[in-house]
């Protein structure tokens, strides 16, 4: 175990687990214990661990060139951007190293759009309570959660939160200074909460009516996680700008900001930049991820396995009502809203060597790699059931 006085910032409440290697949906500790990884690095390891195509891609690129900066053309960027724009609403792509950076780019793109159109007063962005958009000063302001804002000085100006799904509050918040609306198609850290499709369609209508840009944060929902390449495809709504990260790198730090040509029109030479973003290693991995995710039949298999898993969780909810209150989510972005404290259920799952991720609203996220098989999904269900059964037995003993 780690030393008590490790020379690290004390910013993480880490579980006492040390993983030495991974294979597919499994992680192995230094002592050889095997865990079913339905945390996937918080929806990052889209193709599981040590996927041979990703390993080969990064090995091959590592023997060529790692980094040159954006002072020069990077062929891998052009290839990956072309594939992303051909498969989405977007015309333009800016590569980053993380989701927070992708959101920063999205925010700057929206503000710069209005500035370049002669409306510098339009800089405010409306967001929704319970959202999570990153940990930079701007993105914690966008998220609006006090626990992340506390102690870092005045909140960055220009972000207005409204209650999740509140149409009247949203309409009232739009002013002559509003530049954009920013929303997650499904809130991840907020507790796997999905707004109604009609609400997202209303956002699109309001943006069109008031000359606002619609920004989707698909950092967690994107790249096959919901069973579609991007979650917006399931809503009937296309954004103007979209932030992407996590699954697109399959575990390698990679993010992107996608936009229509019009929305990106203000992002001219010199107004934004990155040193590492779009580096050749990241581009090799991103292209390798898309080789797999965009292959014929892959997303259909994701949807099939997701159905097995979702139906199984629904059955467990019925059988363990004192432990499981509700099943939420889409595809392989699923949440268990617990009746017991979610930390207790997460700990019980970990005792069964199953990994999940805590979220808000007393929810545990289950985020299996997209390569999970139906058999592995059933193994996960068996472990959730064992955890629920142990908590039920514990409750009975107390009673």
From Swiss-Prot:
Pfam families: Aminotran_3. Pyridoxal 5'-phosphate binds at residues 99-100, 132, 217-220, 275. One of its GO terms (biological process) is L-arginine biosynthetic process. N(2)-acetyl-L-ornithine binds at residues 135, 274. The modification N6-(pyridoxal phosphate)lysine is found at residue 246. GO terms for molecular function: identical protein binding; N2-acetyl-L-ornithine:2-oxoglutarate 5-aminotransferase activity; pyridoxal phosphate binding. Homodimer. This is Acetylornithine aminotransferase. It comes from Agrobacterium fabrum (strain C58 / ATCC 33970).
């Amino acid at each position: 175990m780690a030393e008590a006085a490790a020379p690290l910032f004390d910013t993480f409440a880490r579980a006492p687990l040390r993983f030495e290697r991974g294979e597919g949906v499994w992680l192995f500790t230094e002592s050889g214990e095997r865990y079913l990884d339905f945390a996937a690095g918080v929806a990052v390891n889209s193709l599981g661990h040590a996927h041979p195509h990703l390993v080969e891609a990064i090995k091959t690129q590592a023997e060529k060139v790692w980094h040159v900066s954006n002072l020069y053309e990077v062929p891998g960027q052009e290839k990956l951007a072309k594939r992303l724009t051909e498969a989405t609403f977007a015309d333009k792509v800016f590569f980053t190293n993380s989701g927070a950076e992708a959101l920063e780019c999205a925010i700057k793109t929206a503000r710069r759009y209005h500035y370049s159109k002669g409306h510098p007063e339009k800089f405010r962005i409306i967001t929704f309570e319970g959202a999570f958009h990153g940990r930079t000063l701007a993105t914690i302001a966008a998220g609006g959660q006090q626990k992340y804002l506390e102690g870092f000085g005045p909140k960055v100006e220009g972000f207005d939160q409204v209650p999740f799904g509140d149409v009247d509050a949203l309409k009232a918040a739009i002013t002559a200074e509003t530049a954009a609306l920013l929303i997650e198609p499904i809130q991840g850290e907020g507790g796997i909460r999905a707004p109604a499709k009609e609400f997202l369609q209303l956002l699109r209508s309001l943006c069109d009516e008031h000359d606002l840009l619609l920004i989707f944060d698909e950092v967690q929902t994107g790249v096959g996680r919901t069973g579609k390449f991007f979650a917006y495809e399931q809503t009937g709504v296309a954004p103007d700008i979209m932030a992407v990260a996590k699954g697109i790198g399959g575990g390698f730090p990679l993010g992107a900001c996608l936009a229509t040509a019009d929305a990106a029109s203000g992002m001219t030479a010199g107004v934004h930049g990155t040193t590492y973003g779009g580096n050749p290693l990241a581009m090799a991995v991103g292209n390798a991820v898309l080789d797999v995710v965009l292959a014929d039949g892959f997303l259909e298999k994701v949807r099939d396995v997701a159905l097995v898993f979702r139906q199984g969780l629904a059955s467990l909810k019925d059988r363990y009502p004192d432990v499981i209150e509700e099943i939420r989510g889409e595809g392989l972005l699923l949440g268990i809203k617990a009746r017991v404290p979610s930390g207790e259920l997460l700990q019980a799952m970990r005792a069964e060597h199953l990994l999940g991720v805590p979220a808000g609203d007393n929810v545990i996220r289950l985020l299996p790699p997209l390569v999970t098989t139906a058999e592995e999904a059933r193994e996960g269900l068996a472990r959730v059931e064992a955890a629920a059964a142990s908590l039920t037995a514990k409750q009975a003993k107390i009673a």
